[in-house]
Amino acid sequence: MLTLTLLLYLSFITTVFSKKVIYEAENGKLDGVSKYNELQGYSGTGYVGRFESAGNSVTVTVEVSQTGMYDMSIIYCGNMGQKINSLKINGKNSGDITFPENSSFEELNIGAVYLNSGENTVSLVASWGWIWIDALVVNDTPNVAKDVSPHINPTLVNPKAIPAAKKLYDFLRSNYGKRILSGQVGGAGQAGDEGQEIQRIQKATGKLPAVWNMDFIFESNDCTWRPENPDITEMAINWWKKYQGKGIMAAQWHWNIAGKTGDFAFYKKDTTFSIDNAVTEGTWEYEKIIKDIDRVAGHIKKLQAVNMPLIWRPLHENDGDWFWWGNNPKSCAKLWKILYERMVNYHGLNNLIWLWNGKNDANTPVDYIDIIGVDIYANDHGPQTTAYNTHFDFYGGKKMVVLSENGRIPDIQQCVDQNAWWGYFQTWNSEFILQDSYHTDAQLKEYFTHKTVMNMDELPSFNVNSYEYQSGNNNNNSSNNNNNNNSSECFSIPLGYPCCKGNTVVYTDNDGDWGVENNEWCGIGNSSSAVVCWSEALGYPCCVSSSDVYYTDNDGEWGVENGDWCGII
C-alpha cells in the first residue's frame, strides 16, 4: 500500500473567522505536489494535489495559545474516489481519516486533536494519495475534556445475557475512562496459548495480559485442515479453569470459504463467494453460511456451558475490501444481524458481548452492537486520538471503543493526556510483539506497568451464577461469585468450583470428572454410578430411550428424541 507523507508546515495564518482559523495549503512548503486552480469552490488562491508518488508532501505549522484538544477539519475534494489517509500530530500518528468521494470542495470534520501550547506540526499521511487539499481549519479555543464513562449504555444488547457476561460488561464499563486493559492475540486457532507471545510479555514485564484473543479461523465447514488436539474450545476451557474465571477472552473469526483453487480462503481475491447471495434466503450461499454459523455456535456453546463470557468479533475489518465480507455495508450489516439472530435466538448463546469492528454509517447495526473495535497498525506509538474520537463521537459516546487489533501499543501516558480512552489494546501476534523493532523490553515494561494499565492480576473472577447490572459503580474489588460451596467436599472445591449434586459427566481431565449444573462447571466425586453425557456440554440432552444412531462426528454418536438431537451414551 502506497504511503505518502504529507507533512503540512503551513507558514502563516491567512484567515480568521470567529473561532476558526484557516490555514491555506497552497501557501505551505510543497514537495512533489503542485498548486492548482482549475476546480471551483476553493478558498484562497488555489489548492494542492495530487500526491501521486511516495514522498510527496505539503507542510503546515499550527500555533495555539494553550495546550488542549482542538476541533479540526480539512477542506478537500475527493473527485478521484474515496481515499483513506492518516493524520500525524507533532510526528505521532493520530489515526486514519476516510475522505468520502465527492465532486466539489467540502469541509470534513475530523474531530478533536491534541495540540501543545505554541507551534505544532500537523501531518496528513495518505495511505492512498490522489486527493485535492484546499485548507486546514482549526478552532482557536480548546475543548472541555470529555467525560467518557457516564453515557455508555448500561446494559448489553442481549436482554438474556448470562450473569458472567453482565459482570464482564459492567466491569469494562466501570473502568472505562479510568483504566486501559492490556491484551494480546495468540497464534492462529489458539486460545489461551501461553506460547512465545505471552512468554515475551511476562519476561519483560512480570505481567499477564488481561484480555486474550483467539480465532475460529479453522472452524468453517470448508476448512480442509485443522490443528490437531487439543482443539480451540478445549484450550479455552482449560485456560478458563486454570485462572478460575479471572481472565477475559475475546475472539474473531477469519471466516474461510472454498477458494478459487480448491483450497479455503477468507480474502476476497481468493474466492468468488458473494456476500449479497449469502444474505439472500434460498441460495446455496445462504445455506452455507447458516451451516458455518451452526458449527461455530457448537463451539461457543461449550464455552457457555462453563460459564465463560466471550467478547465476540465476527466480520472484522468490514470497512476494508480485503475480506469477502468487506466493503459492502448493506449486506455486511444484514449478515451481522443473521449472525446475531442465529446465535442468540436460535442457539441460545447468551454469553456473547458483540464487538463491531468495521464501517460506521447509516447501515451500521447499532442496536446489535455492545462495543466498538478499531484496528490500527501504525509506524509509531502515537495515541491514535483522531481515530478514537471519530468512533466515540459516531455513537454519541454510548459505546466503549477499544483497540481490537494494534501493531504498536499506543503510548499510554499520551492516551491519558489526550483523552484517548481505549478500553483495551490488543497487540497482534508474532513479530508485532516478539521483535524489538515493534516493542523493546523497556517499552513493554513501561506500558504494562503504567498505573493506568490493568493486567490479569487485577481482574476479579467473572465465573458467577447471579449478577445485576450496577449503576456505574466500580466493581473491581467485588467478587459476586455465588458458587455453592456447601456441597460435600470434592476435588473441585480448591479449584473454585462447587461439587455437583448429580453425577452426569460431561468432561474429564487430570483433575477428575466434571459436570455442568446451572450453566457452571462442578466437580463429580468418585462414584461408580457416574453417567457420561458428553452432549450436555454442547447444549443437547442425553438420549433417554433411543439407541438408534442418526449421525456420528468427532464428539460422539447422535440420536433424535422429541424432534431434537440427543447424545447417545
Swiss-Prot record:
Task: Outline the extent of the GH26 domain.
Answer: 163-457
- A GO MF term: carbohydrate binding
Question: What InterPro entries does the record tag this protein with?
Answer: CBM10/Dockerin_dom, CBM6, Dockerin_dom_fun_sf, Galactose-bd-like_sf, GH26_dom, Glyco_hydro_26, Glycoside_hydrolase_SF
> Catalytic activity annotated for this protein?
Random hydrolysis of (1->4)-beta-D-mannosidic linkages in mannans, galactomannans and glucomannans
A single Gene Ontology biological process assigned to it is: substituted mannan metabolic process
The chain's disulfide connectivity reads: none
| CBM10 domain sequence ranges | 489-525, 532-569
**Pfam families xrefs:** CBM_10 (PF02013), CBM_35 (PF16990), Glyco_hydro_26 (PF02156)
Q: Where along the chain is substrate bound?
A: 284, 322, 377
Q: What is its EC number?
A: 3.2.1.78
Residue span(s) of domain CBM6? 21-139
Q: Which residues form the signal peptide?
A: 1-18
List the active site: 317 (proton donor), 405 (nucleophile)
Keywords (alphabetical) are:
Glycosidase, Hydrolase, Repeat, Signal
CDD domains, sorted: CBM35_mannanase-like
Carries keyword Cell membrane? no
The family annotation for this protein states: Belongs to the glycosyl hydrolase 26 family.
From the Swiss-Prot or TrEMBL record, give the protein name. Mannan endo-1,4-beta-mannosidase C
